[in-house]
């Protein structure tokens, strides 16, 4: 059984909106509904768990009607806490693999879901990633130090793992930027799956405007 964990518990404070960004509506759908729709259509996914804050349960329940949705789980104050809540909820389902995705990355393609899961079956863990094409610098005391671009990737989601591996990675708590970090500390090789620029995360208002433009054509994009 392959289960997608859709993280939708963030506060979206950098967006400066009264509503968390995952619940902002673009082209008739809330942001979280875009990746959710991809999971529901994907033949590679058997079930979906949506993680959000208790005060948004009713909103999610009204928007979600599908047999693939296994449940709505209360998230924590941090990303890692939310992932652990989902893993605990999933114990009774005994999934083989779980796929973790940020709801603020609305434009998820089915081919990426399938490929990340395929690579995770080979190594135990895989993530969507994008080669960096920009110049990178580290700034300290107003001095710029240039970072070589070769071998530098942006880590995206979705990320897929053996359920047992991800559960073990989180069993001692901890706070992580994403889930590949604690998994790699177990000595597990993380497979990288090439993504594309559409996998961006909506963080600022400018991102939301770009998302509106893409959403108008999303159903036509293969």
From Swiss-Prot:
Which HAMAP family does the UniProt entry name for this protein? IspD (MF_00108)
Pathway field of the UniProt record reads: Isoprenoid biosynthesis; isopentenyl diphosphate biosynthesis via DXP pathway; isopentenyl diphosphate from 1-deoxy-D-xylulose 5-phosphate: step 2/6
Would you tell me the protein name for this molecule?
Answer: 2-C-methyl-D-erythritol 4-phosphate cytidylyltransferase
Question: What are the recorded Gene Ontology BP terms?
Answer: isopentenyl diphosphate biosynthetic process, methylerythritol 4-phosphate pathway
Functional description taken from the UniProt entry: Catalyzes the formation of 4-diphosphocytidyl-2-C-methyl-D-erythritol from CTP and 2-C-methyl-D-erythritol 4-phosphate (MEP).
Q: Where is this site: Transition state stabilizer?
A: 14, 21
Q: Which domain of life is it from?
A: Bacteria
Among InterPro entries, the record links this protein to:
IspD (IPR001228), IspD/TarI (IPR034683), ISPD_synthase_CS (IPR018294), Nucleotide-diphossugar_trans (IPR029044)
Which NCBIfam families does the record match to this protein?
A: ispD (TIGR00453)
- Which organism is this entry from? Thermotoga petrophila (strain ATCC BAA-488 / DSM 13995 / JCM 10881 / RKU-1)
- EC category: transferase
* One Pfam family this sequence matches: IspD
């Amino acid at each position: 059984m392959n289960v997608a964990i859709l993280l939708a518990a963030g506060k979206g404070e950098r967006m400066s909106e009264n509503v968390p960004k995952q619940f902002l509506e673009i082209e008739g759908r809330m942001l979280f509904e875009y990746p959710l729709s991809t999971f529901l259509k994907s033949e590679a996914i058997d079930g979906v768990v949506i993680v959000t804050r208790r005060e948004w349960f009713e909103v999610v329940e009204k928007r979600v009607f599908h047999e693939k949705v296994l449940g709505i789980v209360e998230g924590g104050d941090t990303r890692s806490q939310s992932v652990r809540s989902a893993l605990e909820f999933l114990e009774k389902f005994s999934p083989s693999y779980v796929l973790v995705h940020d709801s603020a990355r609305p434009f998820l393609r089915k081919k990426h879901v399938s490929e990340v899961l395929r690579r995770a079956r080979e190594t135990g863990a895989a993530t969507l990633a994008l080669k960096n094409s920009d110049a990178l610098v580290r700034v300290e005391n107003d001095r710029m130090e240039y970072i070589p671009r070769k071998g530098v990737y942006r880590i995206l989601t979705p990320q897929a793992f053996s359920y047992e591996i991800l559960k073990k990675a989180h069993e001692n708590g901890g706070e992580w930027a994403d889930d590949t970090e604690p998994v790699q500390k177990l000595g597990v090789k993380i497979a990288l799956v090439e993504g594309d620029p559409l996998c961006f995360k909506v963080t600022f208002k400018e991102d939301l405007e770009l998302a509106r433009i893409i959403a108008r054509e999303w159903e036509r994009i293969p």
